[in-house]
Each structure stands twice: as structure tokens, then as C-alpha cells.
Swiss-Prot record:
UniProt cross-references to Gene3D superfamilies, sorted A to Z: Pleckstrin-homology domain (PH domain)/Phosphotyrosine-binding domain (PTB)
Tissue: Expressed in pancreas, heart, leukocyte and spleen. Expressed in both resting and activated peripheral blood T-cells. Expressed in breast cancer.
Processing and modification events after translation: Constitutively tyrosine-phosphorylated. Phosphorylated by TEC. Phosphorylated by LYN. Phosphorylated on tyrosine residues by the insulin receptor kinase. Results in the negative regulation of the insulin signaling pathway. Phosphorylated on tyrosine residues by SRMS.
Domain spans labelled PH: 4-119
Record GO biological process: cell surface receptor protein tyrosine kinase signaling pathway; cell surface receptor signaling pathway; macrophage colony-stimulating factor signaling pathway; Ras protein signal transduction; signal transduction
Lineage: Eukaryota, Metazoa, Chordata, Craniata, Vertebrata
Descriptive protein name: Docking protein 1
Amino acid sequence: MDGAVMEGPLFLQSQRFGTKRWRKTWAVLYPASPHGVARLEFFDHKGSSSGGGRGSSRRLDCKVIRLAECVSVAPVTVETPPEPGATAFRLDTAQRSHLLAADAPSSAAWVQTLCRNAFPKGSWTLAPTDNPPKLSALEMLENSLYSPTWEGSQFWVTVQRTEAAERCGLHGSYVLRVEAERLTLLTVGAQSQILEPLLSWPYTLLRRYGRDKVMFSFEAGRRCPSGPGTFTFQTAQGNDIFQAVETAIHRQKAQGKAGQGHDVLRADSHEGEVAEGKLPSPPGPQELLDSPPALYAEPLDSLRIAPCPSQDSLYSDPLDSTSAQAGEGVQRKKPLYWDLYEHAQQQLLKAKLTDPKEDPIYDEPEGLAPVPPQGLYDLPREPKDAWWCQARVKEEGYELPYNPATDDYAVPPPRSTKPLLAPKPQGPAFPEPGTATGSGIKSHNSALYSQVQKSGASGSWDCGLSRVGTDKTGVKSEGST
């Protein structure tokens, strides 16, 4: 079993359900040895670390802190200490930050012992608190241009897996440095030694940035060395990184505004020097127009159009204005609409003092404004031939009268249709007894043998048949001789 370098009571601050509270623990610091690594262990009470079985010790959620992962150990000031006279110190690792507290002498001893075991090869010293050394006769003045923005702004971060991080090959733990003009990502060696810079992102090329309780993230632009994309770093100091970046951006913005002010002053001074030197003014546009043409200014076969005098437009002057006389001498032509507002003010004053129904100044004179031609649909017309356009082919709706007694329409009862009987075949018609027979049947419309006649008094069985056959068909019957 390794021997402990230091042990004693320590207050550990924990946060659960949004509330922070101090919990008293028993801390034991073990140095690095062949049997184990340098570590700081926490227990509920004093007897938990010595002997006993494995089940006799009940440790907290934060069981062991490996000193190899320790980044910094520094005293801090807290608003609510766990007990009167206690001082706190912060122990930062690559994953999270721990806030510890003890009485003042024990807290200083803990910080010194932790630094000695966590940074054996580093150079660390504690600042003396009493009897500071007196300065020599040499006076020192602070430099107002010194900007310690990046000092103390190095944070241990762990790169989260994103598309941009995979494209740049970033994975694992790094150190993120917040500088005056950019964010720089530094690589870390095996012994937690900071190596050379790996990537940098200028503040002017960051689209947006933000933080969370456990991470810090920003979105890089297309012009960044890493290319566009979102980079997310897991850290417990996301709020500190966010504030440092925001402060650096505000300071850079203020410096940019100051630089713009210096540029304006330089431009003003340059203009003053030019004015004092009395440099010739550049030629005006009229001089350029009046200058003689060059030798090859126009092609040989080009035609020059003679300048024609400019004509005034129709409404260049108001109606009540008087044109200048030609014999008054040579005067420069006044610009167009030079007295427009003056006449308008006069007309407004005249309208207020006199009849308000006077015509406005910009009314067009008669005969000048063309009358627009009347279109086909200018005047509304009443529709005609409604009986033909709106006629209906058949009456719609109910055509039967309404019966209010039965609250229904007077529909007649359905009629029962009798089935039609099939026509009976017509048999031979027998004449009534006592009717005349013989040659009385000579109708050409009746068919042959349409009537059967009985024999007469002579008793001949084919009486009359031979005549009918002879008269009708011209063929002699069998009974004829």
C-alpha cells in the first residue's frame, strides 16, 4: 500500500438539482509510485481509507482525481464559504473543475502539495503575501498598450465529433487559447506539455459562437484555414471561454473604430496640404466639350451632326411666367425649373388670400392636352335581350301545387296499368244464315278462299267456286266439264 503524502478534511462543492452545497469529506493525496499513479481520493469519513474491507469504504461520486489530468491549482474567492475562516481553491482537470475548501493554513498547504505532485517538472512558485520586496530607485511605468487578453485564457478542451472536426482530423484533448485577434488550438504532449499551434480561427471570420454548461461551440466561415463548419469542444469552462471571446471581439471592434478615425484625420490633413499647395483645378465639363478634337478622334467616313439649338419643353415655365427679352443683352441661361418653387409659393399665398376655388398652377391649358379617345366600355350600359340571355329551357323545381294541410306536394296516386293481352288469331268468318250467296262476292281486295259458302238449292257441292276461280285466276276448276 502506498503511503499518503497528505490527508485531512476538505469541503467539496457539489451541484444537484440546480443548488450548490458544500459537503465535508476526508481527502487523501497519494504520490506517483510503481504501485499506482498520483491521485487524490475522497472518502466520507476518516476511517474509510485505512484497512477495512473493500465494502467498508463508501466513496463519493467524485471518487479519484488523477493528478496527471490536472491542469491548474489556484486559490479562489467564494461568496459563501462552508464555514467561517475557510478559504477555497480550484482544481481544474481536462474534463471538469472541482471547487475545494479548508481552513486558511490547510488550504495553502493543500495547494502547495498538489502543485508539487501534479507538476513535478514544472516551475511553480507561490506569490509572497507579506513583506513584499522594495523596489530600487529605478522607476517602472506600466505600458498602456499592453493587452494581456490571452494571458490566463488557455483552456483544456475535448473535441466533439462533428463533420468539420473529422475533416480536419481533430480528436482527443487540446488546449484552446483565446488571443487578441483569433482563437488558437494547441496540441498537447504526453506529459501535458503544450506544443505548437495546430489551427487558428480569426474573430472576423467566425459566423457565430455560443456556450453551454459543458461545452463551447462556434461556426467557422469559408475563409478560415479549417474551412467552414461547426466545432464543438467539451469543457466545464464554457462560460469563461465565451466571456473571453466576447471581450476580445469588443476590444478589436473598438480598435477598428479608432483606426478609422485616424484614417479620416489623415485624409483631412492631406486635403489641407493640397489646398495649401494651390494645385490647378481639373478642367470642367464645358472645357472638355469645347476642346478641339484630336487627329484620330473620329473615323474618316463618319458624319458630324451639326449641334441644333436646344428647344424648351412644353411645360418648362409656368403659365404666368414671362420669357426673357432678346435685347436685354447676353445672359447665361438659367437652369430648368429654377423658379418653380418660387411661383408655387406665390400661388399658394394667392390662393389663401383670395378665392380658394382658383385653378391650380399646374392645370393644362385648353387645347394642349390631347383628349384621350373614348373606348368601347367607357360608359356603362344596361343589359339588353335579357329574355334571350337568361331564358331557361325547362321549368326547374317542383311543378305540383303545395298542400299546406299535409305539408307536402299534392302528388296524385299512382295509376295501375293493366297488362296488354296478346291479340287472338282471326278465324274464318261464317256468314249468317239467310244471307245471299253466289256471285255477290266479287271483291278484288279479298284473298282467294277467304270466305266459305254453303251449297245452294241445286245441291251442287262446287256451286259458284268454278266462277270465282275462273274469274280470279282464269284456271278451270276440277268440277267443271
